[in-house]
């Protein structure tokens, strides 16, 4: 974590005129735009990484690099206050305001703070771009159900479950393709962590927490076709238990308690 935080400090440039740090000349997290400045997902990820390094150092009693704090505190993340949404990157043209399918991922996994309106609008912009331009690569839609649960939108959860896998299946064996297009991307993609996170952190409403290891941050919600979800042998800090989501309620079976801390 120290090395990663040091990297983001070295990669950031201080803009004296605007009193902020910027990350310039990057490939967007969506991989579709090259040589852009202040990609939203990149900068939000850098902030979270720096803050995790700071907190980890404090817990371990290690020195905290003051540059981590300064850079995280003044890192620029483009935001359209009039429209209440995050664009893909600084200066993205109006027609491309959120073509980046990865932009909603600043909600999850980066947990960048924002209003519910900004989260909803940014997500809807991405969904509109998918409808117009195609489904994009698997990385982003696989995590969309997490954002849908955060918004508490049942119809959106149902829609995002289908979006997260169906466009990427290829016959005759339903192999996973990296992209939604019928050809041109990697076939038999085996990185299934995005899909797995839907069930561990998405429909349960859980997030990692410093105090308990894991705690409930959002209301648990299942896609309509799924009536019950059981996660068995969850082990956190020496405690082993099962998690059950049923009827939009979450129960813990076994371990030291029967209720996840809210």
Where on the chain are the PLM-derived regions?
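The feature captures the catalytic groove of carbohydrate-active enzymes
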Residues: 6-70, 248-253
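Structured mid-domain segments that build the active-site/substrate or prosthetic-cofactor binding neighborhood
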Residues: 1, 6-11, 123, 130-131
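Solvent-exposed, flexible loop/coil residues
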Residues: 25-31, 36, 40, 45, ...
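Active-site core of glycosidic bond-cleaving carbohydrate-active enzymes
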Residues: 39, 43-47, 51-198
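A glycine-rich phosphate-binding loop feature that marks nucleotide/adenosyl-phosphate handling sites
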Residues: 24-26, 65-75, 180-181, 215-225
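Non-catalytic C-terminal accessory modules of carbohydrate-active enzymes
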Residues: 155-262
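Structured loops at beta-to-helix junctions and adjacent beta-edge loops in soluble globular domains
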Residues: 26, 109-111, 246
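Short, well-ordered loop/turn elements at secondary-structure boundaries
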Residues: 17, 100-101, 238
């Amino acid at each position: 974590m120290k090395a990663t935080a040091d990297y983001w400090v070295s990669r950031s440039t201080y803009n004296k005129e605007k009193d902020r740090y910027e990350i310039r000349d990057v490939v967007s997290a969506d991989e579709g735009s090259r040589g852009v400045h202040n990609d939203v997902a990149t900068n939000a990820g850098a902030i979270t990484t720096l803050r995790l390094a700071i907190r980890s150092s404090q817990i371990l009693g290690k020195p905290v690099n003051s540059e981590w704090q300064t850079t995280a505190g003044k890192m620029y993340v483009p935001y359209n206050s009039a429209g209440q949404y995050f664009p893909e990157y600084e200066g993205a043209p109006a027609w491309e305001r959120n073509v980046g399918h990865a932009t909603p991922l600043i909600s999850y996994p980066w947990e960048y703070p924002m209003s519910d309106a900004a989260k909803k609008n940014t997500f809807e912009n991405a969904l509109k771009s998918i409808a117009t331009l195609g489904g994009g690569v698997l990385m982003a839609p696989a995590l969309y159900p997490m954002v849908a649960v955060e918004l508490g939108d049942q119809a959106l959860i149902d829609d995002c479950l289908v979006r997260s896998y169906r466009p990427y299946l290829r016959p005759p064996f339903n192999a996973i393709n990296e992209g939604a297009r019928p050809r041109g991307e990697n076939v038999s993609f085996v990185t299934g962590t995005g899909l797995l996170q839907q069930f561990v952190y998405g429909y349960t409403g859980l997030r990692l927490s410093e105090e308990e290891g894991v705690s409930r941050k959002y209301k648990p919600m299942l896609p309509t076709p799924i009536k019950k979800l059981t996660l068995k042998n969850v082990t956190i800090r020496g405690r082993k238990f099962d998690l059950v989501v049923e009827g939009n309620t979450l129960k813990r079976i076994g371990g030291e308690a029967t209720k996840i801390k809210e």
